[in-house]
């Protein structure tokens, strides 16, 4: 790309403008990268907590594993509730949209208390907690992934600015400046040479 730039005063001016813009925008990118690093750290912690809650509720379910083989109890759990909707919004965090759960709405249905033991209530409560924690952990992991992807992209851009665009533009400015300086010296030399020849011809003419 840099080899296609013409070594002219106009090209020199354009490269200077380009460098100024790059150097102006780089601090903004670095700030965004720093903010994203903080958000990613928070998202990792949030996802870890949600996953831990999900795994703990899953272990509580496993403690009743044998009971899940009894159709009567399984039917009681299945019929007791279901996820009606997950109220999820997207918030702008350092320029990227991330999901945030506002509410998880469960529809509740009654089951026969007479046909099921009293501890089925506990089993239903554990099942509800398991389902809710599963949804929360999935959204938290999604949020973490989105922020990590954005951080990766911004980091690539920062490296591009620091390692490629700014150095290349700086070198091109220097190259054009040297070329223009050399050409200026050459032009001055040619002017002096032309004047000298004119003077010589004038002197020769006068002598004749």
Swiss-Prot record:
GO annotation, biological process: proton motive force-driven plasma membrane ATP synthesis
UniProt keyword terms in alphabetical order: ATP synthesis, Hydrogen ion transport, Ion transport, Transport
Pfam families listed in its UniProt record: ATP-synt_D
UniProt xrefs under InterPro entries: V_ATPase_D
GO molecular function annotations of the record: ATP binding; proton-transporting ATP synthase activity, rotational mechanism; proton-transporting ATPase activity, rotational mechanism
Coiled coil: none
The protein's role, per its UniProt record: Produces ATP from ADP in the presence of a proton gradient across the membrane.
Family note: Belongs to the V-ATPase D subunit family.
NCBIfam families named in the record: PRK02195.1 (NF002565), V_ATPase_subD (TIGR00309)
HAMAP family given in the database record: ATP_synth_D_arch
Protein name: V-type ATP synthase subunit D
Source organism: Chlamydia abortus (strain DSM 27085 / S26/3)
